[in-house]
């Protein structure tokens, strides 16, 4: 797994690291021909430079306003053939190239001063069923909300992916794809059948390759690399195909069906009433619950929560989440809160709301202010709960008085369940024993 780098931004062009990529032939022309034959002309290709009125909108489209890049130009693309052209131009000119889908990357991998060319995927948003592959094709510029809506309204299915509806599919899937349904259904990449990716071979030729999970596919290692290897690492993804391993030709049976409804909740504890002891007990209880219910046979897989340990000046420690409404949701939530609050002398406030699943999926995480953040983050996975010493360090930094800004904190997401049924080497996402995801 160490060969897969999540931080490897391609320098001077896209170089494929997989031997199977250099086989002759290309699918770019076929894809372009199919697009042109069945659809209106797509936008692009357009190479937008500093003198173009669109430049500022495209260059500053990132979620994290702490980092804003100034590339020489941004390519607006509408087809795989356009992406091939953009990649070839970057290789020929020697310019450093990267790619942006939804713009939710927290680091400066796109907004790096060294980046000269950005390929903007936001016009490639198609979602359709591909009968030839018995899989759902999703273009890399589609937002999660669009994917949820089209898959659910069209076929009654979904992929288990993130909670923020305006996250782009392109980078999200390449990080594994985790969200509120993952404990029930696994990661997005556990349902990834194929990927179309523009690479550059050893002769400096940009071209599109389709790699599948089929054992006989000579490009299978390229598929594997895209099941958690990180965005922009091996090429520019233009399209994904999703299908849960299943037989039959009925699209409604080829991906999981989400619950009809969910119980959404937001629970809060008043910081003024939490002392060092009660804070430690709350965090310890949460860790114990997450460990106990991370196994694939837990009766609580339908429950997903995020405990946000915010700084004391913010006023509250809070927990958000949802429970599949067809699983005894009220009882399950009551038991979850009771377990976390055991021995904590503070009664939490707990507003809840019953919602149709699609409405909840499109609404996203409660309180998300949208693309207005300026932040630095780090994430990780925990097999076991925090130690008492670690909890003490958390409390110290969340309550210290020499820094009075309310921003900052640690969020703990329940993990495991179906995610942990997959072998660590089956995909490029090796974290298959975790009980908590930390952010």
Question: Where do the PLM segments sit?
Answer:
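N-terminal secretory signal peptides and thylakoid transit peptides that target proteins
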Residues: 1-17
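Short, structural beta-strand-to-alpha-helix junction motif
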Residues: 134-138, 142-152, 168-169, 353-357
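C-terminal region of N-terminal signal peptides and the immediate post-cleavage residues
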Residues: 19-37
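Loop/turn elements at helix/coil->beta-strand transitions in domains of secreted/extracellular proteins
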Residues: 92-96, 114-115, 154-158, 233, ...
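Glycine-/small-residue-rich beta-strand-loop submotif within the FAD-binding core of flavoenzymes
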Residues: 65, 110-139, 180, 184-185, ...
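FAD-binding subdomain of flavoenzyme oxidoreductases
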Residues: 161, 166-270
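Glycine-rich N-terminal segment of FAD-binding domains in flavoprotein oxidoreductases
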Residues: 52, 63-124
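Cofactor-binding catalytic cores of oxidoreductases
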Residues: 36-63, 102, 107-110, 252-439
């Amino acid at each position: 797994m160490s060969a897969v780098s999540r931080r490897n931004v391609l320098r001077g062009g896209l170089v494929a690291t997989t031997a199977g990529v250099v086989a002759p032939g290309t699918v770019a022309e076929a894809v372009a021909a199919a697009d042109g034959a069945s659809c209106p002309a797509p936008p692009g290709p357009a190479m937008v430079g500093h003198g173009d009125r669109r430049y500022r909108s495209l260059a500053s489209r990132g979620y994290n306003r702490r980092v804003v890049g100034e590339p020489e130009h941004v390519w607006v693309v509408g087809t795989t053939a356009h992406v091939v052209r953009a990649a070839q131009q970057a290789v020929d000119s020697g310019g450093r190239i990267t790619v942006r889908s939804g713009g939710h990357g927290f680091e400066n991998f796109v907004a790096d001063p060294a980046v000269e060319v950005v390929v903007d995927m936001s016009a490639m948003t198609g979602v359709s069923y591909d009968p030839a592959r018995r899989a759902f094709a999703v273009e890399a510029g589609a937002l999660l909300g669009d994917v949820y809506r089209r898959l659910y309204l069209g076929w009654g299915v979904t992929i288990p992916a993130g909670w923020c509806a305006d996250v782009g599919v392109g980078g999200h899937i390449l990080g594994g794809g985790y969200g509120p349904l993952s404990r029930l259904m696994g990661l997005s990449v556990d349902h990834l059948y194929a990927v179309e990716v523009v690479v550059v071979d050893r002769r400096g030729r940009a071209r599109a390759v389709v790699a599948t999970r089929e054992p006989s596919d000579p490009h299978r290692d390229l598929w594997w690399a895209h099941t958690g290897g990180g965005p922009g690492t091996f090429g520019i993804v233009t399209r994904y195909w999703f299908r849960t391993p299943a037989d039959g030709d009925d699209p409604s049976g080829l991906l999981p069906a989400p619950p009809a409804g969910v119980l959404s909740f937001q629970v809060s504890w008043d910081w003024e009433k939490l002392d060092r002891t009660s804070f430690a007990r709350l965090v310890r209880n949460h860790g114990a619950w997450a460990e106990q219910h991370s196994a694939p046979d837990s009766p609580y897989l339908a429950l997903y929560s995020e405990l946000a340990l915010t700084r004391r000046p913010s006023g509250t420690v809070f927990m958000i989440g949802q429970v599949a409404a067809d699983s005894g949701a009220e009882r399950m939530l009551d038991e979850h809160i009771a377990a976390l609050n055991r021995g904590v002398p503070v009664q939490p406030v707990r507003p809840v709301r019953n919602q149709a699943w699609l409405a909840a999926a499109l609404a996203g995480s409660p309180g998300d202010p949208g693309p207005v953040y300026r932040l630095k983050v780090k994430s990780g996975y925990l097999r076991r709960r925090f130690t008492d010493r670690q909890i003490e360090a958390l409390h110290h930094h969340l309550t210290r008085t020499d820094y009075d800004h309310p921003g900052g904190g640690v969020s703990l997401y329940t993990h495991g369940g179906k995610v942990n049924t997959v072998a660590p080497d089956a995909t490029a996402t090796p974290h298959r024993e975790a009980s908590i995801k930390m952010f």
